[in-house]
Swiss-Prot record:
Gene Ontology MF term list: peptidyl-tRNA hydrolase activity; tRNA binding
GO biological process: protein quality control for misfolded or incompletely synthesized proteins; rescue of stalled ribosome
Active site positions: H19 (proton acceptor)
Oligomeric form and interacting partners: Monomer.
Name of this chain's protein: Peptidyl-tRNA hydrolase
Xref: CDD domains: PTH (cd00462)
Site positions per UniProt: Stabilizes the basic form of H active site to accept a proton: D91
Pfam families from the UniProt entry: Pept_tRNA_hydro (PF01195)
Hydrolase in keyword set: yes
Domain of life: Bacteria
Site (described: Discriminates between blocked and unblocked aminoacyl-tRNA): N9
Gene of this entry: pth
Enzymatic class: hydrolase
InterPro entries: Pept_tRNA_hydro, Pept_tRNA_hydro_CS, Pept_tRNA_hydro_sf
Amino acid sequence: MKLIVGLGNPEKRHENTRHNIGFEVIDEMARLFQTGMTTGKGNFHHAKITHRGKGVIVLKPMTYMNLSGHAVVAAMNFYKIPVEEILVICDDLNIPLGSIRLRAKGSAGGQNGLKHIIQCLGREDFARLRVGIGRDHPSGSYSSFVLGKFSEEERKTADSIIPECAEAALDFVVHGIEHAMNRFNRKNA
C-alpha cells in the first residue's frame, strides 16, 4: 500500500491558491479514478484507489499546512504504511511555475508542511514531489505570495502541470521514486 499526500490548507478561501496545488493534484488523481474523497480516521480526507494492481491511499490533510504531519502520521498508523511508501506533494516557490522536482529524501527547504511532517516522523527520508509555483515572486512576504491565487496566465500553466504531477505520482506507485525522478525531473527545475 502506498500513501500519496497532497498538501494544502482547508477552507474554501484557500481553494485555487498557490499553496494548495498539492490538494489539486490529489483531486486530479481522484477524478482519474472516478472516486470521491471521504473523511478518514484522523484529520484528513482520503480515497482508496488501485493502480496496476497496487493499493494507494490519496490523502488531503484537513489541518492547516503547518500541522500536516498529524494527518500523515494518523494515516500511516491506521493503514500500517511505512515511510518508504509515502510520497508528499507540495508547492515550492523556488522552482519555476510549470516545473516539478521529485526527491527521495531531503530537508523541508522552507516548506512548512514538509517541516511539520519531518518533525512528526523524526526523519527526512520520504519521497516528495515539489511543484513549482514561481521564482518570480515579489520580494517581501512569502506568505502573501503562496496564499495568493494564480493570475489568469499562471492558472493556465498550473492547470497544465497538474495532470503531469498525477502521472508522476502514479509512476512512483508502480516503479518507485528513482524511476519517477529519472522520468519527470527537468533541468530547469
